[in-house]
Regions:
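Loop-to-helix entry region at the N-terminal start of transmembrane alpha-helices
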Residues: 70-80, 135-159, 199-202, 206
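A structural signal for multi-pass alpha-helical bundles of membrane permease subunits
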Residues: 30-45, 77, 127-139, 207-213, ...
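Interhelical loop and adjacent transmembrane-helix boundary motif
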Residues: 8-14, 45, 52, 57-69, ...
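Hydrophobic positions within alpha-helical transmembrane segments of bacterial inner-membrane proteins
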Residues: 33, 82, 86-94, 98, ...
């Protein structure tokens, strides 16, 4: 009770108990991942008894991550789907966000609701719905890589729209109106003023789409047509119930490093865009009118 009383007496203070709870949560979240990464470097096949450091499960022994065709193919297929999702969902979500932000006519509210629907729909419902769609309506596409890419893009598109629209709201209309007042064509105002200001949101959206695609299991599983379209999460799920080796840990570690590297790179680019936000005014002043 004393903790709650002190919190309500000074809600803007620095509650020590909150720092303790946060630390416990972070440690609890990191421990399983750290153990999985540790056994990727195990010298033996055991996944419960650590015998020494080794890189054999990455590229040094038969059955290692880069020697096992199934593991290597799953990793490459995951990266392929993630790249396709980023390349398609990011620009498409950007233009949808721009359109929805400017749409004030009839049906705008319903369209906004439909755009947010994938965020609140259970992923298993989305997976089953897409499976039935590709079987009964779009049978000419069939299950496989194309269907998986479309499914992931459908699911992740809403993230891009929400993030970009949030940035559009914070930017406001002042920069565009200033460029228009100076006689800049709409396309020039978009290309030289608005898009640089949207840079942080675009980069953040692309990073989230990439991470979401790389981690997706349910939709990718439903739209798969066999071993050739297995991703890392699908392979980890199927093999971990049998007699897995630390090579699985190695593949998971590689995927984790790629994801973290992508997020770090996106953060650095985000900071670069954020620090150069004032350049929009300079662009307006130097527009070729």
């Amino acid at each position: 009770m004393s903790l709650l009383a002190s919190f309500f007496r000074n809600p803007w203070g620095r509650p020590r108990w909150l720092a303790v709870v946060t630390t416990i949560y972070i440690v609890w979240s990191i421990i399983p991942v750290s153990i999985a990464i540790l056994f990727a470097f195990n010298a033996s096949r055991s996944r419960s008894n650590f015998t020494g450091l080794s890189l054999r499960w990455f590229n040094g022994a038969t059955g290692s991550a880069f020697h096992d065709d199934a593991l290597r193919h799953a990793l490459l297929h995951s990266l392929e789907l993630a790249a396709l999702s980023v390349v398609v969902a990011t620009p498409l979500g950007l233009f949808l966000a721009l359109g929805l932000q400017r749409w004030r006519g009839r049906g705008a509210g319903l369209t906004n609701l439909l755009m947010l629907l994938p965020l609140v729909t259970p992923e298993i419902v989305m997976g089953v719905a897409l499976l039935l769609l590709f079987i009964s309506v779009f049978g000419f596409i069939g299950l496989g890589t194309t269907a998986q890419a479309i499914g992931q893009i459908t699911f992740s598109l809403s993230y891009v729209v929400v993030i970009v629209r949030g940035r559009l709201v914070s930017i406001g209309k002042d920069y565009e109106e200033a460029a228009a007042d100076l006689g800049a064509p709409p396309f020039d105002a978009l290309r030289r003023v608005l898009l640089p200001l949207l840079g942080p949101a675009i980069v953040a959206s692309a990073a989230i789409v990439f991470a979401t695609s790389l981690d997706d299991f349910v939709i990718t599983q439903y739209l798969s047509n066999g071993p050739d379209t297995q991703t890392v999460p699908m392979l980890l799920y199927s093999v971990s119930r049998g007699a897995p080796t630390p090579a699985l840990n190695a593949v998971a570690t590689i995927a984790l490093v790629i994801t973290i590297g992508t997020l770090v790179a996106a953060f650095l680019v985000y900071r670069r865009f954020s620090s150069s936000g004032g350049e929009a005014a300079t662009e307006i002043a130097t527009l070729d009118l």
